[in-house]
Curated annotation (Swiss-Prot):
Keywords: Ribonucleoprotein, Ribosomal protein, RNA-binding, rRNA-binding, tRNA-binding. GO terms for molecular function: rRNA binding; structural constituent of ribosome; tRNA binding. It comes from Roseiflexus castenholzii (strain DSM 13941 / HLO8). This is Small ribosomal subunit protein uS13. NCBIfam families: uS13_bact. Gene3D superfamilies: 1.10.8.50, 30s ribosomal protein s13, domain 2 (4.10.910.10).
């Protein structure tokens, strides 16, 4: 099993798809990496040679910010917005949508589940 940037790539998938399992590398960046490493995108991960894996690993480590470093950078950017108190930071702090979506209805992903409705209880059967 090929391991790149701390991620085990699935053996049965093509390298074109498998490389997108690395956080921070999507289809476009993955295609660029494979082009630079001179690897056929249709090759299955199990069929890659050690040399090809090491070339891919080297390019990813040298040119891209991935996994933990990228997650840390994103968190630091959000923290910076919250610290300076800008509008986007306040929205992050309150747990509301940041990019202008409506909140009168919807916004459930960001706000969480609705609280339990008051006054609606299952009646117990009397015998």
């Amino acid at each position: 099993m090929a391991r790149i940037a701390g991620v085990d790539l699935p053996r049965n998938k093509t390298i074109e798809i498998a490389i997108t399992y690395i956080f921070g590398i999507g289809r476009s960046n993955g295609a660029d990496v494979l082009r630079k490493a001179n690897v056929n995108p249709a090759t299955r991960v199990r069929d890659l040679t050690e040399e090809e894996v090491s070339r891919i690993r080297e390019i990813v480590e040298r040119e891209y910010r991935v996994e933990g470093d990228l997650r840390r950078e994103i968190q630091m950017n959000i923290k910076r917005l919250m610290d300076i108190g800008c509008y986007r930071g306040l929205r992050h702090r309150k747990g509301l949508p940041v990019r202008g979506q409506r909140t009168r209805t919807n916004a459930r992903t960001r706000r969480g589940r609705r609280g339990q409705a008051i006054g609606i209880k299952k009646k117990t059967l009397k015998k």
